Amino acid sequence: MKYVELNLFPEEEEETQKSSDSKWNNKYTSDKGKEYNSDKGNEYSSDESNKYDFTNLFERLSKSAFRSRFHLSQKDREYIAEKGLATIRKHAEDFVTKRLAPAIIPNDGKQTPMRGHPVFIAQHATGCCCRGCFFKWHHIPAGRQLTREEQQYAVAVLMAWIEKHYS
């Protein structure tokens, strides 16, 4: 499998300082209790309780023949190792904002490729690939713009799945 280099993420080209008006909370807590800071790419333990508990969700997803067939390939793992989880999280934020969050998505149900990026794999594995699946698995209705909190939730789901399957 070959990854297509898209210049969708100019922040990878050069390190920039965090702007004070950032729309994202740059920390997330995985289902394993680890916190990640996307500005620094550092992983550190947290005593703080998790904001989300994905145990029930991942249990339900594991019972789906379609959802449970998705796994990270060796190329996906190498890509994550090369870019780092903080960068992968930024990609997830961007994909959620552009492909899942809008109220009207002209190609809804077909907007997420089945391969080519670890986040795409995670989107299909977690039911965050289109608004129909997002409603079915996460009970967040289509036909309206996702709130900032709902977008952060989707990113947290994706990153928890990636971390679980990467380690």
Show where each model-derived region lies.
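Iron-sulfur (Fe-S) cluster-binding segments and ferredoxin-like electron-carrier domains
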Residues: G132-L158
